[in-house]
């Protein structure tokens, strides 16, 4: 069965350009994870809270995230449609759950895109010698978003080429720098290997346990978004094979390469005290061993990786909006479901940009965006995995047709337990660490978004939009032996 015939079996027709291969689909997920951005932005916080031993939180979180990635990979194989979280939960638990899963994921990607663009602008404004004022950073953020929109406007092929090159530069740059620093640290014996297991003195084990949990937030914030490739399923050749591999490979490589970079930088750190309080600790470590042009090259690599993350986020969010619009699940669905001559959802692209820009106007923008984005991501993960578990346990006939047989109850239960633990951690750490003003802003923003969705849901309360009554999952069942797990 061809890709177009598979799509028709779900009740849809081919509208987007199906031109992505293995590496491009992998690059979408890897860019959204944006390992380099997370490490450069939050390394100092992790080191300050947990000491050198905090590097192992990356591995622990990576293992937990891989449980979720395995569930998502199988769902992507069974349901190769754009609008992944929306489509998956719709097939497993119905339209109501799908509506909320889709909208929460829209919030996650729009706020995430705004936050990443703001972070890039924060680097670029002082780099070009401009006054580091909030006004200049916001203007640079808008310029970044518009640039990403222009690239997306002219087709997925152009966007994928830019993203592919950026990912290759990020992987090569981070691995080379990590290996060089690791080699230098081992040759010079800057620190023994046991240094990686040291931590700040705490009066009790419980005290350090909380510090370690705090330091693990860097990994929790960074190692998500691996499922983004599923949102370009209708633009990927053989998506039932390539998207699952992209999901798993992007998460595994982000964990492996990220751990390598963390170990290399931590063993090479000249002073934990200085690095943990430095505004750009990884650049401080690089500058301690290499000349300025290497530091400038590292900053360029980070900037390229962050821009690729913005680009991939925009690609992902516009496909999600478009997929929900063709089913009548968003306002102005007819307008947002339009596809241009370049075979991209052009109206969704230019609607997403100003909405994302609005989030950068708040004071304490980074805290608010991070809170909304991270909570939205893990809540959606919970809805998807919970729907999969529900279909297995509560609806055997549905599970037989629509849930891959080897997405076992045990795997779903373990993944859901992990997600709930992360949500509890995020809630606890947000309450004890965020300022009262920022917390109020975040809660108000969440309340306004929820109220808008409820109003829209009440106004639009009619049948099931224009979507097919149920995707024809029975047309492509997995056999007992078919599994990528």
What are these regions (language model features)?
Residues 371-377, 406-485:
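A generic transmembrane alpha-helix motif of multi-pass inner-membrane proteins
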């Amino acid at each position: 069965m061809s890709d177009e015939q598979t799509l028709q079996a779900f009740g849809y027709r081919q509208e987007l350009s199906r031109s992505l291969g293995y590496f491009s689909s992998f690059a979408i997920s890897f860019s959204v994870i944006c390992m380099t951005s997370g490490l450069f932005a939050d390394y100092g916080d992790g080191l300050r809270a947990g000491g050198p031993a905090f590097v192992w939180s990356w591995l622990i979180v990576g293992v937990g995230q891989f449980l979720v990635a395995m569930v998502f990979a199988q769902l992507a194989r069974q349901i190769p449609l754009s609008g992944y979280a929306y489509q998956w939960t719709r097939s497993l638990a119905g339209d109501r759950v799908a509506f909320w899963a889709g909208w929460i994921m829209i919030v996650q990607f729009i706020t995430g895109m705004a936050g990443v663009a703001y972070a890039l602008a924060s680097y670029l404004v002082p780099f070009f010698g401009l006054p580091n004022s909030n006004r200049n950073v916001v203007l640079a953020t808008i310029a970044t978003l518009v640039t990403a929109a222009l690239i997306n406007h002219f087709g997925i092929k152009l966007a994928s080429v830019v993203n592919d090159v950026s990912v290759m530069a990020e992987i090569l740059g981070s691995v080379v720098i990590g290996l060089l620093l690791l080699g230098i640290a081992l040759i010079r014996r800057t620190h023994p290997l046991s240094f990686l297991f040291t931590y700040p003195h705490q009066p009790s084990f419980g005290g350090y346990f909380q510090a370690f949990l705090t330091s693990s937030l860097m990994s929790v914030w960074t190692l998500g978004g691996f499922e983004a490739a599923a949102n370009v399923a209708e633009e990927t050749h053989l998506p039932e094979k390539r998207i699952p591999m992209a999901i798993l490979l992007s998460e595994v490589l982000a964990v492996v390469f990220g751990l390598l970079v963390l170990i290399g930088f931590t063993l090479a750190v000249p002073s934990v005290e200085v690095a943990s309080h430095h505004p750009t600790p990884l650049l401080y470590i690089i500058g301690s061993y290499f000349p300025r042009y290497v530091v400038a090259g590292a900053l360029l690599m980070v900037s390229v990786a962050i821009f690729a993350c913005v680009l991939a986020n925009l690609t992902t969010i516009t496909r999600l909006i478009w997929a929900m619009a063709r089913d009548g699940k968003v306002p102005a669905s007819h307008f947002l479901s339009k596809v241009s001559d370049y075979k991209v959802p052009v109206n969704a692209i230019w609607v997403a940009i100003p909405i994302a820009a609005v989030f950068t106007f708040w004071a304490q923008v980074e805290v608010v965006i991070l809170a909304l984005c991270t909570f939205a991501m893990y809540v959606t993960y919970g809805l998807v995995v919970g729907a999969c578990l529900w279909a297995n346990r509560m609806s055997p006939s549905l599970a037989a047709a629509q849930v891959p047989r080897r997405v076992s109850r045990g795997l779903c239960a373990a993944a859901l337990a992990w997600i709930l633990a992360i949500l509890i951690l995020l809630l606890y750490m947000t309450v004890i660490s965020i300022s009262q003003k920022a917390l109020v802003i975040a809660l108000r923003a969440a309340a306004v978004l929820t109220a808008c969705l409820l109003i829209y849901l009440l106004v639009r309360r009619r049948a099931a939009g224009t979507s097919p009554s149920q995707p024809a999952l029975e047309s492509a069942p997995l056999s007992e032996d078919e599994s990528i797990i």
